[in-house]
Amino acid sequence: MALNLDRGVCAAAFACAAAVTAVSPAVAQEKLKPVVLRFAADFSPPPHPAAMALQYFAERLPQVIPGSQARIYYAGALYTIPEAFEAMRQGNLEMSWMQMGKAAPVEPRMMAVVGPGVLTTVGAVDSLEKTKTYQELVARLATNQHIKVFGAAHMSFGMGVGGSKRYLKPEDFTGRKVRSMGPVENASLSSWKASPVVMAFGEVPSALQSGVIDGLMTSIGGWLAVREQAPYYTTGGAGAFTGDYYMVAASERWWNRLPKPTQAVLEKLVQETIQKEKELNWCVDKMTYEKYGTKDPSKPGVYWMTPQEVQQLVAAVGDASQRYVKSKLPPDATGLVDQFAKEGRALDKANPPGSSWVEKIDCSKYAGQIVIK
């Protein structure tokens, strides 16, 4: 379940590089319509890996479609994720990089793939798009919500909890106000007797400063943005504290108005960007742990839990997350939760730790780009 940070994870990933689909010069030479698009996200600016990927997208867009511009809005500066979801559905927002679970207030079925203990290896997470559950959700978004999903991207494999104190055992959460990322995480935090507070990341720094929250559930990349206010960060690897995933999406009402050649180039650029994000995500996790990792939980920094410590937290949650999700879904959709759990177990078995191309990425190529402060 752990990130295997102490192993030789920096082997050259030629298969990964080959998987990146470059924008075809032949297509790019066709008559393309310049686009000016807004890209909404609910995570902090660089060095957050997804933010660096969006920065890459913004730089590449005018290169492949001359005259185009991407306006990036971080940390809910333009819309929260539910607001972005609604805006895309109505054709009032072009694109969004969103956390699936945060779309639940608008499309409850998105919660079916969210929660701890389902996809618990790097390879399993990278195989999310192969699941029937994910594919059914993508089809539903297109049919019912008029939202086009390009694909899934990775959230940190070091999702965890940060604060001015260490959150390690269930009793560490008792009575504490902890920022939750969405409704499914509320069930986990409540099981640990914490008081979950749902808020966009842009509100977190001031909430920590004022005492509105005592800690926050976030990614390693998110923690870097509040490290001075929340110097203790605890993680247990993929699926320990939570399981949630990014999806990159666009408004179909906007997308369908674009000429086919423009769509083709944009599609390839988005896939290129998702691939870039997966590499950056892994390397930010790895390089952050190398700089701030600690094996002593009494000291500040990133503490990687032992399997026994992870099990203690997971056992306290039990099936609370699944029960919560089912309680919020219509009766004909509750089967999605069990279906995804079954698919997750199969993917974990098929993708043991250390077997994924992600774990073999050569992070040295990003040494000049990723600056961990």
Predicted regions and their residues:
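A short hydrophobic/aromatic micro-motif that marks alpha-helical segments and, especially, helix-coil
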Residues: 21, 136, 274-277
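Low-complexity, intrinsically disordered/propeptide-like segments
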Residues: 6-8, 17, 96
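Bacterial N-terminal signal peptides that target proteins for export
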Residues: 1-13
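Bacterial N-terminal signal peptides
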Residues: 11-22
